[in-house]
Amino acid sequence: MATVQEIRNAQRADGPATVLAIGTATPAHSVNQADYPDYYFRITKSEHMTELKEKFKRMCDKSMIKKRYMYLTEEILKENPNMCAYMAPSLDARQDIVVVEVPKLGKEAATKAIKEWGQPKSKITHLIFCTTSGVDMPGADYQLTKLIGLRPSVKRFMMYQQGCFAGGTVLRLAKDLAENNKGARVLVVCSEITAVTFRGPADTHLDSLVGQALFGDGAAAVIVGADPDTSVERPLYQLVSTSQTILPDSDGAIDGHLREVGLTFHLLKDVPGLISKNIEKSLSEAFAPLGISDWNSIFWIAHPGGPAILDQVESKLGLKGEKLKATRQVLSEYGNMSSACVLFILDEMRKKSVEEAKATTGEGLDWGVLFGFGPGLTVETVVLHSVPIKA
């Protein structure tokens, strides 16, 4: 008869959790950032607020965003005038949209990831679904299981209302699942739609306007598993270690509240300052075991909360301009897609590394870091190891 320890040992994987495929998706409708202030103030019937519109234009100009994708079209907004007001009861209308569209967009990303992985979906043992867009029972995890046709016995984890740090959280959870369940293949999906946060402007709530200038829609999916079968699976990144921390003196720095008016967004403190002041501590703790202290010697995937965060992190750590190139590229092309962003950046980096004939998936470097920043202020840190690119 097997002992508990023998059973335990048999359940564990031998190697580290590894990203085996990545897929991304966006709604069909996109907006150009340069034209967005005119469109936004027109659709919300706020054109009389000329000073506020000028402020919003400056926010959009400084955002370093060229384009964003949005499920909400002019037609949908005209049918739902309460969503265009600043604080009108509109949660039902928002929920009706997101409970359908969040799993649908997630399915698009997941289908691409499964196709790249190349294995039957019946081999998926666990599903992690993450969204800050709407809440329902049974959740988006259940809806996605049905939409894709996963096994009814797939083990599901639903993460709601985590916000912008959650791209790190899902990888942390996927790592623990893959390494503690031999043969596990974890499908991770982050799907975000701004229909829950879109609202008209108010000169009493400028931080809400910041959100209107930055947030975009997108979904990303990854497959994570340990001990890949390299005859049929292609490793992309190894997840080496993970941590989560709440930054000191950051209570209320970023808040979101789900109300009758939808999800409201509040920035109460100097978020870029708080992150840049504390980031070196997180890096030092994560990389001390590896003897790494030169932050230019690793590849970087940082949640692009906004350009000011990236600028201050770059300056504080003395990072070379190219270090945040993939991060800035995703911000420019998609805006801030909350939890999905870092997975889009992983995808961007592995593709560019191949295009530019780099030696590894990490821009030719071996070690890298993935950061999620969000409400709390919470920071997720993931240490990544790249994989050699075979010519």
UniProtKB/Swiss-Prot annotation:
Pfam families: Chal_sti_synt_C, Chal_sti_synt_N. Keywords: Acyltransferase, Flavonoid biosynthesis, Transferase. Pathway: Secondary metabolite biosynthesis; flavonoid biosynthesis. The keyword Transferase applies. SUPFAM superfamilies: Thiolase-like. GO terms for biological process: flavonoid biosynthetic process. This is Chalcone synthase 2. It comes from Citrus sinensis (Sweet orange). The lineage of its organism: Eukaryota, Viridiplantae, Streptophyta, Embryophyta, Tracheophyta. The gene is CHS2.
